[in-house]
């Protein structure tokens, strides 16, 4: 048997079928093969990782053109600042986030009960 047959299968989860990214459930190294699972644990794809992707980070599961929307959990989370290939790490180096933090509200002062 070769060495790769002894290695634990690497995993990532995709939240919806419309998503262009999956979330790494393991630390992924360039060259790793990763099984993409749905929330129901069904294997919906497999791809070769082209960049190191830390646990909890996003990796592309389909080609994303420069200027195209990046979708996670069925929501647009940003726009690609460069072309992104399947298996690439998706983070601030290749997307422009559309996240807008909610306005800060002043917390009410605590009152002591008499």
Describe the role of every protein-language-model region.
Residues 2-114:
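N-terminal small-residue-enriched
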